[in-house]
Regions:
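Conserved N-terminal beta1-alpha1 strand-loop-helix module at the mouth
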Residues: 1-87, 247-248, 253-264, 268-271
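Short amphipathic alpha-helices and their capping/turn segments at secondary-structure boundaries
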Residues: 1-13, 46-48, 125-134, 218-225
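Short, well-ordered coil/turn segments that N-cap beta-strands
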Residues: 13-17, 52-55, 84-86, 115, ...
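Conserved, mostly hydrophobic/aromatic
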Residues: 19, 57, 91, 117, ...
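Active-site beta-loop-alpha junctions enriched in small/polar residues
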Residues: 20-26, 62-64, 93-97, 122, ...
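Conserved anion-binding
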Residues: 25, 96-184, 202
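Active-site-adjacent beta->alpha loops and helix N-cap segments on the catalytic face
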Residues: 66-81, 97-101, 122-136, 188-198, ...
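A C-terminal functional module that forms or caps the active site or interfaces directly
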Residues: 187-234, 238-239
Length: 272
């Protein structure tokens, strides 16, 4: 998917919502456990009910990989369910180099046809560029994440006072472009989102941490939006686990619509 196609979806739906698919078997509604593939049934109903409001879906591959070969089959089936005009993200956080990275890219881009994959850039250029060699595909680099442990490394400063995440942003812009490179920027870092935007004015951000983790959607839009929106704000638990009853998918739809309505207002206010 191209940047222009992604922005067209945002404009059409007045939304920059990414629905995270984290199907924890222990948290699924009880009635689904009698299904041949409970995880697939869960994701299928979530996608069907939220597709009107979502511009992206982000399956967390760990929740599929944990079930071995069957889990991989389920992941492939879920990816195939995502409408082709909606951006798909393999949240796999791969981070190896060379031929290994190329094989990861083939797995997610060629065999499962995801539009993008999350990548850990700790090993440097060698761990990122293999993903950028696939036309129409994206690498989404972990830059400034929302978890408490991000303080261990990402905000460490060098002798000049530059934080490690800033070095990641600076160097990685040499490897890709706003057409194939995004960054993970956590919503709980609201005070720093504006600084990240100044450093990478054109790139899209994938923003976790809104809702259950305490991040502010309004702050994300205020400090992070650019002329192409430039934001994919992820919500997982707040949507997919809003109900554990048989109405879970309908409740998920309502929660997705609530976020979309907030996003419509923010797009009207800040898109320029």
């Amino acid at each position: 998917m191209t940047r222009a196609e992604l922005f067209a979806q945002i404009q059409q739906k007045s939304s920059f919502l990414c629905v995270g698919l984290d199907p924890d078997l222990d948290k699924l509604p009880a009635h689904l456990h009698s299904e041949p593939d409970p995880i697939f049934s869960f994701c299928q109903q979530i996608i069907e009910e939220t597709a009107d409001f979502a511009v992206a879906y982000k399956p967390n591959t760990a929740f599929f990989e944990a079930h071995g070969a069957k889990g991989w089959e389920t992941l492939a089936k879920v990816e195939a369910l995502i409408p082709k005009h909606i951006f798909s993200i393999a949240d796999a956080k791969r981070g190896d180099i060379g031929n290994t990275a190329t094989r990861y890219a083939e797995a997610f881009f060629t065999h499962m046809n995801f539009d993008s994959i999350t990548v850990a850039p700790y090993m440097g250029k060698d761990s990122v560029t293999p993903f950028l060699e696939f036309e129409g595909k994206w690498a989404i680099l972990l830059a400034l994440t929302s978890n408490p442990g991000s303080l261990d490394f990402q905000l460490l400063q060098d002798a000049s006072g530059k934080a490690l995440y800033q070095t990641v942003l600076e160097k990685s812009q040499e490897w890709g472009s706003p057409e194939n490179l995004m960054y993970v920027v956590g919503a709980t870092r609201g005070e720093l989102i504006g600084e990240v935007r100044k450093q990478v004015p054109e790139h899209f951000f994938l923003v976790p941490g809104v809702g259950a983790q305490g991040g502010s959607l309004a702050d994300v839009a205020r400090f992070g939006m650019n002329s192409s929106c430039g934001l994919l704000v992820n919500s997982s638990r707040g949507i997919i686990y809003a109900s554990k009853e048989k109405d879970f998918a309908k409740v998920a739809r309502r929660e997705a619509q609530k976020l979309q309505e907030e996003m419509r207002e923010l797009l009207d206010r800040y898109l320029h």
